[in-house]
Protein backbone atom coordinates (compact mmCIF):
# COMPACT_ATOMS: atom_id res chain seq x y z
CA UNK A 1 0.00 0.00 0.00
CA UNK A 2 1.16 3.51 -0.77
CA UNK A 3 -0.64 6.26 1.12
CA UNK A 4 0.09 9.97 1.25
CA UNK A 5 -2.00 12.45 3.18
CA UNK A 6 -0.95 15.56 1.31
CA UNK A 7 -1.72 16.23 -2.34
CA UNK A 8 1.64 17.91 -2.86
CA UNK A 9 3.36 14.57 -2.33
CA UNK A 10 1.30 12.92 -5.05
CA UNK A 11 1.89 15.85 -7.42
CA UNK A 12 5.64 15.67 -6.83
CA UNK A 13 6.14 11.90 -6.75
CA UNK A 14 3.56 10.60 -9.21
CA UNK A 15 6.03 9.98 -12.08
CA UNK A 16 8.14 7.82 -9.73
CA UNK A 17 5.31 5.80 -8.17
CA UNK A 18 2.57 5.55 -10.81
CA UNK A 19 3.69 2.11 -12.02
CA UNK A 20 4.29 0.58 -8.60
CA UNK A 21 2.07 -2.49 -8.17
CA UNK A 22 0.48 -1.25 -4.95
CA UNK A 23 -2.84 -0.02 -3.68
CA UNK A 24 -2.53 3.78 -3.74
CA UNK A 25 -4.68 5.89 -1.43
CA UNK A 26 -5.26 9.49 -0.42
CA UNK A 27 -7.65 11.52 1.73
CA UNK A 28 -8.25 14.06 -1.05
CA UNK A 29 -11.08 13.38 -3.54
CA UNK A 30 -9.61 15.69 -6.20
CA UNK A 31 -6.21 13.99 -5.98
CA UNK A 32 -7.82 10.55 -6.18
CA UNK A 33 -9.67 11.55 -9.35
CA UNK A 34 -6.59 13.23 -10.85
CA UNK A 35 -4.40 10.13 -10.53
CA UNK A 36 -7.02 7.38 -10.59
CA UNK A 37 -6.18 6.24 -7.07
CA UNK A 38 -8.41 5.30 -4.16
CA UNK A 39 -10.07 7.98 -2.06
CA UNK A 40 -10.27 7.17 1.65
CA UNK A 41 -12.78 9.29 3.58
CA UNK A 42 -11.92 10.44 7.05
CA UNK A 43 -12.63 12.78 9.92
CA UNK A 44 -10.74 14.33 12.81
CA UNK A 45 -11.19 12.18 15.92
CA UNK A 46 -9.06 10.21 18.36
CA UNK A 47 -8.67 6.46 18.07
CA UNK A 48 -9.41 3.98 15.31
CA UNK A 49 -12.61 3.73 13.33
CA UNK A 50 -14.19 0.44 12.31
CA UNK A 51 -16.34 2.17 9.70
CA UNK A 52 -14.99 3.01 6.24
CA UNK A 53 -13.79 6.33 7.71
CA UNK A 54 -10.30 6.80 9.06
CA UNK A 55 -9.02 9.29 11.59
CA UNK A 56 -6.82 11.94 9.98
CA UNK A 57 -4.51 12.18 12.97
CA UNK A 58 -1.92 14.59 11.53
CA UNK A 59 0.13 11.97 9.66
CA UNK A 60 0.08 9.35 6.94
CA UNK A 61 1.44 6.85 9.46
CA UNK A 62 -1.52 7.34 11.76
CA UNK A 63 -3.89 7.04 8.81
CA UNK A 64 -2.15 3.84 7.67
CA UNK A 65 -2.68 2.35 11.12
CA UNK A 66 -6.43 2.86 10.69
CA UNK A 67 -6.33 1.47 7.13
CA UNK A 68 -4.48 -1.61 8.41
CA UNK A 69 -7.08 -2.03 11.16
CA UNK A 70 -9.84 -2.08 8.53
CA UNK A 71 -8.27 -5.31 7.19
CA UNK A 72 -8.99 -6.99 10.56
CA UNK A 73 -5.46 -8.18 11.33
CA UNK A 74 -4.57 -10.24 14.38
CA UNK A 75 -1.60 -7.95 15.01
CA UNK A 76 -0.14 -4.70 13.67
CA UNK A 77 3.60 -4.05 13.85
CA UNK A 78 4.85 -0.47 13.80
CA UNK A 79 8.18 0.27 12.10
CA UNK A 80 9.54 3.79 11.72
CA UNK A 81 7.14 5.33 14.24
CA UNK A 82 9.52 7.23 16.48
CA UNK A 83 7.59 10.56 16.78
CA UNK A 84 10.80 12.41 17.54
CA UNK A 85 11.94 15.72 16.13
CA UNK A 86 15.24 17.43 16.79
CA UNK A 87 15.33 19.11 20.19
CA UNK A 88 15.96 22.40 18.36
CA UNK A 89 12.95 21.97 16.02
CA UNK A 90 10.80 25.12 15.77
CA UNK A 91 7.66 24.69 13.67
CA UNK A 92 6.51 28.28 14.09
CA UNK A 93 9.81 29.52 12.67
CA UNK A 94 9.76 26.71 10.07
CA UNK A 95 13.08 25.42 11.33
CA UNK A 96 13.59 21.67 11.07
CA UNK A 97 16.46 21.67 13.50
CA UNK A 98 19.61 19.60 13.57
CA UNK A 99 18.08 16.35 12.29
CA UNK A 100 15.35 15.49 9.77
CA UNK A 101 11.79 14.80 10.88
CA UNK A 102 11.51 11.56 8.91
CA UNK A 103 13.51 8.33 8.77
CA UNK A 104 14.17 8.89 5.05
CA UNK A 105 15.46 12.43 5.56
CA UNK A 106 13.78 15.79 5.29
CA UNK A 107 11.38 16.56 2.49
CA UNK A 108 12.62 18.89 -0.24
CA UNK A 109 11.46 22.50 0.30
CA UNK A 110 8.47 22.20 -2.03
CA UNK A 111 7.07 19.31 0.04
CA UNK A 112 7.84 20.58 3.51
CA UNK A 113 4.72 21.26 5.51
CA UNK A 114 4.36 22.74 8.93
CA UNK A 115 1.21 21.33 10.47
CA UNK A 116 0.02 22.53 13.79
CA UNK A 117 1.95 20.17 16.01
CA UNK A 118 2.93 20.25 19.62
CA UNK A 119 6.58 19.30 20.02
CA UNK A 120 8.05 19.20 23.50
CA UNK A 121 11.64 18.17 24.19
CA UNK A 122 11.88 16.80 20.66
CA UNK A 123 8.78 14.59 21.01
CA UNK A 124 5.70 15.01 18.80
CA UNK A 125 3.38 14.94 21.84
CA UNK A 126 0.19 15.58 19.86
CA UNK A 127 0.65 12.41 17.81
CA UNK A 128 1.86 10.38 20.78
CA UNK A 129 -1.40 11.31 22.54
CA UNK A 130 -3.38 10.10 19.52
CA UNK A 131 -1.59 6.74 19.66
CA UNK A 132 -2.44 6.53 23.36
CA UNK A 133 -6.11 6.88 22.43
CA UNK A 134 -5.68 3.90 20.08
CA UNK A 135 -4.03 1.86 22.85
CA UNK A 136 -6.90 2.65 25.24
CA UNK A 137 -9.39 1.27 22.71
CA UNK A 138 -7.63 -2.12 22.76
CA UNK A 139 -9.16 -3.14 19.43
CA UNK A 140 -6.13 -4.95 18.01
CA UNK A 141 -2.72 -6.08 19.23
CA UNK A 142 -0.15 -3.44 18.25
CA UNK A 143 3.58 -3.94 18.76
CA UNK A 144 6.01 -1.08 18.28
CA UNK A 145 9.27 -2.33 16.76
CA UNK A 146 10.70 1.15 16.26
CA UNK A 147 13.99 1.59 18.15
CA UNK A 148 13.93 4.67 20.40
CA UNK A 149 10.26 5.42 19.78
CA UNK A 150 8.48 8.03 21.88
CA UNK A 151 5.30 5.94 21.57
CA UNK A 152 5.27 4.10 24.88
CA UNK A 153 1.66 2.91 25.01
CA UNK A 154 2.17 -0.34 23.04
CA UNK A 155 4.43 -3.27 23.85
CA UNK A 156 7.78 -2.95 22.09
CA UNK A 157 10.35 -5.41 20.83
CA UNK A 158 13.07 -5.88 18.27
CA UNK A 159 11.66 -6.81 14.84
CA UNK A 160 13.95 -9.87 14.63
CA UNK A 161 12.39 -11.34 17.77
CA UNK A 162 8.85 -11.44 16.35
CA UNK A 163 7.44 -14.76 15.27
Task: Label the predicted regions.
Residues 1-163:
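Metal-ion/cofactor- or nucleotide/acyl-coenzyme-handling active-site neighborhoods
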Amino acid sequence: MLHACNYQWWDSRWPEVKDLPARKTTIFEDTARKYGIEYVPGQWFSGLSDSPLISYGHSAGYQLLNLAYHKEPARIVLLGYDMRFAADYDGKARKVGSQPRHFFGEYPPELQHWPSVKVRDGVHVELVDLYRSVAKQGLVEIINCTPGSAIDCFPSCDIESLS
